[in-house]
Amino acid sequence: MTTDTSGRTGAPAAAAPAERFRYGFLKGNPQLTKNGELKHLLTIEGLPRAILNQILDTAEQFVSVTDREVKKVPLLRGKSVFNLFFENSTRTRTTFEIAAKRLSADVINLNINASSTSKGESLLDTINNLSAMHADLFVVRHASSGAPYLIAEHCAPHVHVINAGDGRHAHPTQGLLDMYTIRHYKRDFTKLRVAIVGDILHSRVARSDIHALTTLGVPEVRAIGPRTLLPGGLEQMGVRVFHNLDEGLKDVDVIIMLRLQNERMSGALLPSAQEYFKSWGLTPERLALAAPDAIVMHPGPMNRGVEIDSQVADGPQSVILNQVTFGIAVRMAVMGIVAGTND
């Protein structure tokens, strides 16, 4: 577990090597072609600012598709998108499916529980068989960190892979839609204070957000949470660590709340949900400590009365539902960009 013996506000947290912030599965950057184009989206870490801006700019063009009578563009007509969700999801899978269909792709949702993997077939055998069916794009969610990397390394050359969340490692499209939301409301990343609050240790969203925020030039990123829920390595990326919510929220422009990921916890890291809310829940009173025009975000699913008060979640500074709307456009942008590249 992470510990910090200094007791100072803003002091870095220490952690065992297994809990360090950075992951590394393959050498180099397997996401890019030899021409520097995006072939796969596996993680935000290591991507240049130009590619992040390309995705955000492309997403901006797709936002208006939602308001059309016919909500389709022909960009991926004739392409086959396979949603491979080895881990349960409703929101992410649905938005990927909507995004692919709005790009005119054919979408196949694989029922993992009834698939060959539950009959003993290996992950790579499954991927090879699906590649032989002339799949063009795999959208992969998996409980094991690094699974999308393995698939990208071994799938057929014509197949593109998008990571829809792997273990505690990364959730790049969530990170990108968070960046789109921030840019939509705040415009200039270089003048912001952004706070990420809660279970950062187990959060792949937090990792993706921090990599994106630092790449896009945010001058102050704060990680706020109990000592047991903060990973080591944050300070090496320039992140300020706070163990007091009131102090950490002071004057911030963006607040990203995270749920407790009890399914990824081993052992008793926290007291009850009620006690957690008393110390770490975002209430109207605590929100008042932030900048007057601060926005409140949450990747979902929300646990009201645990990490966030309903008055805040439903209040005028909340942009949580807009994140969901923007997520479709961002995933359209990612699929359109990767499926249009050639190695």
From Swiss-Prot:
Gene encoding the protein: pyrB
Pathway listed: Pyrimidine metabolism; UMP biosynthesis via de novo pathway; (S)-dihydroorotate from bicarbonate: step 2/3
Amino acids binding L-aspartate: K119, R204, R259
SUPFAM superfamilies linked to this entry: Aspartate/ornithine carbamoyltransferase
Keywords: Pyrimidine biosynthesis, Transferase
Name of the molecule in the record: Aspartate carbamoyltransferase catalytic subunit
InterPro entries: Asp/Orn_carbamoyltranf_P-bd (IPR006132), Asp/Orn_carbamoylTrfase (IPR006130), Asp/Orn_carbamoylTrfase_sf (IPR036901), Asp_carbamoyltransf (IPR002082), Asp_carbamoyltransf_Asp/Orn-bd (IPR006131)
Function noted in UniProt: Catalyzes the condensation of carbamoyl phosphate and aspartate to form carbamoyl aspartate and inorganic phosphate, the committed step in the de novo pyrimidine nucleotide biosynthesis pathway.
Superkingdom field: Bacteria
Family to which this protein belongs: Belongs to the aspartate/ornithine carbamoyltransferase superfamily. ATCase family.
